[in-house]
């Protein structure tokens, strides 16, 4: 199975399954000298961790990360960083009834057809449990980006089902279980989720992620454009079915006179492009959005088939998130951080000595 690594200069490779012994990752390319401990990663892992609220899966995993290599006396050495998280709360018996049954909307059928066998326990490698290691690796990237380049990354839920944020208050994001920036909608979100859980159904969500302080010049046209790599990374998150950069699909109804980001010596007057022009960062905030589908692991009966080709009914048991978007915020942050880290190192390798006489623009 290929496709377990991302990046060229900052390379993250993950391994492990939902109900396996452990999850792990190897980070190659992290510069030496970065102060790093498990605590630097644990905060984001706790934000993603299951069982932290009544709106997420009841599976309780401490997700305590261990550094196995690449750090000496509290600093990165420039060699491969090995990270490990043990699985401690598997209940594989919950999945014994679907050993030969395909859950509609999941990867069961496609994994079976591609590999000729599959780990049916919680989806195995296709489970979002794997994203814990992406968050750990992303936390390393986030620390380097912030400490060395002053880049900050913040994600939030901008929409859950029919409920959208109408105001954006970053101080509210970490104060509620939804990572929602509009405090006036929290009661409606709570009521909506309570009714959803009663019905045994699930719902989709939209997650937004913003990176500020990104310098001009990141991105490698034409095939490694910054927005292309961001889209690639975000689409690699479980359940993501759509990615937008800047105004995204909203540009369909825009006129050229409306959507262009006008410039002056004082800076850009807008940011419809989401901080990327021609595949290269413009110095403005990078803005991306992802759409996550509702999980198909629900207690509402549905039609499917067995591995032997017989008709069957599926009622999913086990512990699942009624809205996977709630825990996707730190995952989206991590994937954006990994891409920015990779492109910073690539830019440094080729363009470190480039000096432009054009003034650097900011936001007015």
Curated annotation (Swiss-Prot):
The taxonomy runs: Bacteria, Pseudomonadati, Pseudomonadota, Gammaproteobacteria, Alteromonadales
The highest taxon in the source lineage is Bacteria
Q: In which pathway does it act?
A: Metabolic intermediate biosynthesis; chorismate biosynthesis; chorismate from D-erythrose 4-phosphate and phosphoenolpyruvate: step 7/7
Positions that bind FMN: 125-127, 238-239, 278, 293-297, 319
Instruction: Please give the PROSITE patterns that the UniProt record associates with this protein.
Output: CHORISMATE_SYNTHASE_1 (PS00787), CHORISMATE_SYNTHASE_2 (PS00788), CHORISMATE_SYNTHASE_3 (PS00789)
GO MF assignments: chorismate synthase activity; FMN binding
**Quaternary structure, from the entry:** Homotetramer.
> Which cofactor does this sequence's record say it needs?
FMNH2
Does the keyword Flavoprotein belong to this entry? Answer: yes
Name the GO cellular-component terms: cytosol
- Tell me the protein family, please: Belongs to the chorismate synthase family.
Binding, NADP(+) = 48, 54
**Disulfide bond positions:** none
Q: Any keyword Nuclease?
A: no
Where is the region Disordered?
Answer: 41-60
- What CDD domains does the entry give? Chorismate_synthase
Give the catalytic activity.
5-O-(1-carboxyvinyl)-3-phosphoshikimate = chorismate + phosphate
State the Gene3D superfamilies in the record.
Answer: Chorismate synthase AroC
Which note does the record give on the cofactor? Reduced FMN (FMNH(2)).
Function text: This reaction introduces a second double bond into the aromatic ring system.
| EC annotation from Swiss-Prot or TrEMBL | 4.2.3.5
Q: What is this protein called?
A: Chorismate synthase
Which keywords label this protein? Amino-acid biosynthesis, Aromatic amino acid biosynthesis, FAD, Flavoprotein, FMN, Lyase, NADP
Q: Which Pfam families match?
A: Chorismate_synt
For biological process, the GO terms are: amino acid biosynthetic process; aromatic amino acid family biosynthetic process; chorismate biosynthetic process
